[in-house]
């Protein structure tokens, strides 16, 4: 979140009390929407952890998702170099746009975003009926079975690579990634944690 010094340095006078706010997906980097905040909206955003704007049409504070349930959960807030624009990184709950797309700028999602969406779906499957969901059945079988499936798919992926079968390699790699994501969820880990670890190693 913003430090106290950063909040003091925000140039509300320059923006006539309404500061433009760019909301970006914290995982994929996709630009989700543009809105405006006054000081009260910023306070509410920081206090609640959900993106809250000042609606210029309704002339009141408006929390994104207050009607639809499609909230934007705040990860971080940062000012630009001129202190007259804010960048909010957020994890969206559902589509951001009222038209049903992930972004108000159209369906511009990067392919990598699908992994995040798949991960969210796999997390929801934890509470599904094992009789109707393969993923729920996998969770119910326990960690050892899930880990075994990851091992099996890893071997099958490697075998497909050794015979240079690109079609089979694609299929087996897909199975491997799916089961690996299930295993991470089973262990209360997520893809973001793995990405952060890879980033640290790269440094």
Swiss-Prot record:
One Pfam family matching this protein: PRA-CH
Gene Ontology MF, one: ATP binding
Record-listed E.C. numbers: 3.5.4.19, 3.6.1.31
Involved pathway(s): Amino-acid biosynthesis; L-histidine biosynthesis; L-histidine from 5-phospho-alpha-D-ribose 1-diphosphate: step 2/9; Amino-acid biosynthesis; L-histidine biosynthesis; L-histidine from 5-phospho-alpha-D-ribose 1-diphosphate: step 3/9
Domain of life: Bacteria
Keyword annotations of the record: Amino-acid biosynthesis, ATP-binding, Cytoplasm, Histidine biosynthesis, Hydrolase, Multifunctional enzyme, Nucleotide-binding
Region feature Phosphoribosyl-ATP pyrophosphohydrolase, mapped onto this chain: 115-203
Renumbered residue ranges of the record's region Phosphoribosyl-AMP cyclohydrolase: 1-114
Gene3D superfamilies found in the cross-reference section: MazG-like, Phosphoribosyl-AMP cyclohydrolase
Catalyzed reaction equations: 1-(5-phospho-beta-D-ribosyl)-ATP + H2O = 1-(5-phospho-beta-D-ribosyl)-5'-AMP + diphosphate + H(+); 1-(5-phospho-beta-D-ribosyl)-5'-AMP + H2O = 1-(5-phospho-beta-D-ribosyl)-5-[(5-phospho-beta-D-ribosylamino)methylideneamino]imidazole-4-carboxamide
Record's subcellular location: Cytoplasm
Disulfide bridges in this chain: none
GO biological process: L-histidine biosynthetic process
GO CC entries: cytoplasm
Matches recorded under PANTHER family: HISTIDINE BIOSYNTHESIS BIFUNCTIONAL PROTEIN (PTHR42945), HISTIDINE BIOSYNTHESIS BIFUNCTIONAL PROTEIN HISIE (PTHR42945:SF9)
Family per record: In the N-terminal section; belongs to the PRA-CH family.
Protein known as: Histidine biosynthesis bifunctional protein HisIE
Protein source organism: Escherichia coli O6:H1 (strain CFT073 / ATCC 700928 / UPEC)
